[in-house]
Amino acid sequence: MSTSNIVDALIIGGGPAGLSAALAFARQNQSAIVFDSGRYRNAATDYMHLIPGLDHKAPAEFRATARSQITDRYDKIRILEGVDIVAAKKTDADSFELSDEAGQTWNGRKLILATGVEDVMLDIPGYAELWGKSIVHCLYCKGYEQRGGSAGVLAVGPLGNVNMALHIARQETALSKRVTLYSNGNESLAGELVSAFGSATAMRTDARKIKEFVAGADGKGVAIRFEDGSEVVEDYLAHQAPVKAREGLADLLGLEKGPNGEVKVSSPFQQASVRGVFAAGDNGAMLKNVPNAVFSGHVAGQMASTQLLADLNGQKSIFPI
């Protein structure tokens, strides 16, 4: 392989984690290619939060600004939009080769997976349509704008247990006057929740079986329609959908995974189980939000850059990577 055809880093994912990793390489005058499929977990939401200076900005605006800042200022970073990487492997030369859907290949000395995850929608009519709007997965990201009224917790799936359901319900009590935990027909869980309420007076349960979700009046809030024909309206409903990896690249590379399917990384260095592969953002973290994606993306970029510079100089890195 000619060294003229290889870049320092291949970064799969053009969200906050991938862009942050690219910026780390840019600041060390190293070359990188970012492959942006155009699929983003927060595409359904109108605004993102928790980033000082960018609070309540549209996710698309954040990405566009980051892309332009990187490519306008740093000439060794390329961002390829609309490119899906379908294959990845480590070569005999201890570098990495990627292939896209059209069969084009790229080679890089280090590889950063920032592919994110995909939320698996519940099989309840209306759930997918309201996801990211009035059905929210993170109360630090959304919920403040709907504060002051009533809210619900959908206590099914990942939230279908006392510990997780109450964890989310407690967050809602800081935002809403009344919190109802909906167990969707699970009478046993509803009873366990009541027993665990303690001194909480703002919480209650509803075990009725849910038929569908529809948008509230003027598109605000969520109406929960039950199989018995009744209906209630909440300002918003919190739920954490199950997630899955967007691409099977981790399996192709033989990477170890954590209990929830995320790429297993060495903390705090973000290196995966194969040397030279780093993971950042939602696909390698328990806390899946924009601030953590930005942080872990920078760490992955810095550590991959640091490891590469040690390799090129025939030395060991100061870090155990």
From Swiss-Prot:
- Report the induction information: Expression is positively regulated by the thioclapurine cluster-specific transcription factor tcpZ.
Question: Known EC number(s)?
Answer: 1.8.1.-
The cross-references to InterPro entries, in alphabetical order and at most eight, read:
FAD/NAD-bd_sf, FAD/NAD-binding_dom, Ferredoxin-NADP_redctase_2
Q: What enzyme category does the UniProt record give?
A: oxidoreductase
Pfam families given in the database record: Pyr_redox_2
* UniProt keyword list: Disulfide bond, FAD, Flavoprotein, NADP, Oxidoreductase, Redox-active center
What GO biological process term is on the record, naming one? Answer: cellular response to toxic substance
* CC cofactor note: Binds 1 FAD per subunit.
In which residues is FAD bound?
Answer: 14-17, 36-41, 49, 114, 282, 289-290
Q: What cofactor requirement does the entry state?
A: FAD
Question: Which PANTHER family does the entry mention?
Answer: THIOREDOXIN REDUCTASE 1-RELATED-RELATED
Quaternary structure? Homodimer.
Q: Which family does it belong to?
A: Belongs to the class-II pyridine nucleotide-disulfide oxidoreductase family.
Q: What is this protein called?
A: Thioredoxin reductase tcpT
